[in-house]
C-alpha cells in the first residue's frame, strides 16, 4: 500500500504540536528532518490518517517505535538496558564507571505538563 505524502501545511501543524520537538524524546527538530509518526498505526490498528493521530518524531524514535502502540513502545524502551547488558563493551564501560545506569520511569516529552 503506497502512502500519500502528507501536505506541507499539515506537516507544519504537526511540527508545531510540540514547538519543534520530538513528541517522544523531546529533542529539537528541524522541520525538514521531522518524521510524522502515526500514534495509532494505520497498518495494524486502523489508526486515522489525520492530524489527531500524528506526532512529530525524530528519525530514531520513529524508527524504533515503528507500528507499536505508545505503551508497547514504552515497554520496549524499558528493556533496552537489560539488552545492553549482553554486550561486552557495555559491561566493560560500566565496570570502569564510564557509564552509570539510572532507573526511572519512561515519560515521553508530550506527557510532561509544561509541553502541552
Indicate residue ranges for each PLM-predicted region:
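Immediate flanking context of iron-sulfur cluster ligation sites
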Residues: 12-16, 45-53
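Short cysteine-rich loop/turn motifs with clustered Cys
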Residues: 6-34, 58
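Alpha-solenoid HEAT/Armadillo repeat architecture
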Residues: 44, 62-63
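Histidine-centered catalytic micro-motifs used for acid/base chemistry in nuclease
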Residues: 35-41
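Glycine-/proline-rich flexible loop or hinge segments
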Residues: 38, 54-57
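Extended charged
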Residues: 1-9, 27-29, 52-55, 63-116
Amino acid at each position: 500500500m503506497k502512502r500519500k505524502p502528507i501536505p506541507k501545511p499539515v506537516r507544519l501543524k504537526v511540527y508545531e504540536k510540540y514547538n519543534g520537538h520530538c513528541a517522544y524524546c523531546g529533542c529539537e527538530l528541524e522541520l525538514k528532518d521531522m518524521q510524522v509518526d502515526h500514534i495509532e498505526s494505520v497498518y495494524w490498528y486502523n489508526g486515522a490518517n489525520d492530524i489527531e493521530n500524528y506526532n512529530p518524531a525524530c528519525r530514531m524514535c520513529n524508527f524504533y517505535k515503528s507500528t507499536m502502540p505508545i505503551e508497547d513502545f514504552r515497554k520496549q524502551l524499558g528493556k533496552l538496558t537489560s539488552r545492553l547488558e549482553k554486550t561486552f563493551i557495555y559491561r566493560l564501560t560500566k565496570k570502569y564507571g564510564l557509564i552509570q545506569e539510572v532507573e526511572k520511569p519512561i515519560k515521553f516529552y508530550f506527557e510532561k505538563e509544561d509541553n502541552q
